[in-house]
Amino acid sequence: MNLKDKIDQKIFHLVGEAADAVGQPCYIVGGYVRDIFLHRPSNDIDFVTVGSGIGLAEALAGKLGPKTRLAVYRNYGTAQLRYRGLELEFVGARKESYHRESRNPIVEDGTLDDDQKRRDFTVNALAIAVNADNFGELVDPFGGLDDMRRRIIRTPLDPDVTFSDDPLRMMRAVRFATQLDFEILPETFDAITRNRERIAIITRERIAVELEKIICSPRPSMGFVLLEKCGLLELIFPELHALKGAETKDGRGHKDNFLHTMQVLDSVAEKSDKEWLRWAALFHDIAKPVTKQYDQQHGWTFYNHNFVGKKMIPGIFKRMKLPMNEKMKYVQKLVELHMRPIALVEEEVTDSAVRRLLFDAGDDIDDLMILCEADITSKNPEKVKRFLSNYQEVRRKLVEIEEKDRIRNFQPPIDGDEIMRIFGLSPCREVGDIKERLKNAILDGDIPNEREAAYKLMLKVAAEMGLKQVEE
């Protein structure tokens, strides 16, 4: 098959001319070729040449002119450059062999055939020639094009060898299946299950990268369900695995919290591309297994699972090498607060409760509401309808009170420094108590969020404490 019409762009002709000039066969390989057939945009282009990848890149840079910036990585035998928004990478064809204790291969110079054999999956083992004499010719020794048409993920060689040599490929198989909505061939999936313990030699950082790509996919639950089925999830994310299953006692059961979490995750993904909102969906019930109890009166309960879940998150993030920064705190915040709107819809929606929710959620209130609405997964359509209707009332109240009271991220009109100055105080408990009284009075609607009202209340509270004003 010839694909010259698919690659009829100036850059490919320039690379081909440079390859001819140095006397080396050169091919476009990897994801860019795959994405041509899947009609997916891509700005990253990998080239393999039989010979020196660095030498070819240097020849191309010479053709492009003195302003071209070439990055050379001699230890890896690769070179990179940018061209009109495209990221180009060049490497010489290689063959690889592995030691069992490491995923880092022993690398030797090889042929195009050797290079294609070392690829993870057939859909990534396609190559398109760019030399003048065979420009556009597709090289597909493992039936990758047919696998794309069949929408399957399959390894070019024995999958047991492929996954044992580089266990990260097990995560990549799940990730590609999720991103592309492909099926992992049963023989390939069975090999993942057999080799799952080999994931232990992969660094947590590399696993985290794959998990992030899964969670950013259009239907992220697909990836986590596959990880659960093959046994990888229990090894890399045991807390999520622990959600699986529904227990019954005295004829009373609870929902499978793993499947529920998957529904919530997909529902959030339909409404938002925010990666860390999706992580919050994944974590929102993470503490249910450790808070689960049964009593005759109430059946199954998970009291305080939102607070316990918040406390679990830093340890999980640290172990999984997820960012221990504001992103983690955001996830903690949504996990802690995700029960609050539910409590509101089950009771009368009071202004005071809405003010406190606005204050605690701040700028993340909209994300919190997306998560909470996704959390309604009852099989009872009337219950779902009722809850969603109540949520609309909560949203209406949020807008109304936000416009009226400016509560989101508010600070009381009088701060601690002013309180200390007015009453001649150093930092002390009384200052904090006055600030707390002012905050609660505003949130409870006892006084408006205005300086004059806050000032009067401050004087009253201070007088009750026996404090005297030293400055007007």
What are these regions (language model features)?
Residues 1-472:
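Catalytic cores of the polymerase beta-like nucleotidyltransferase superfamily
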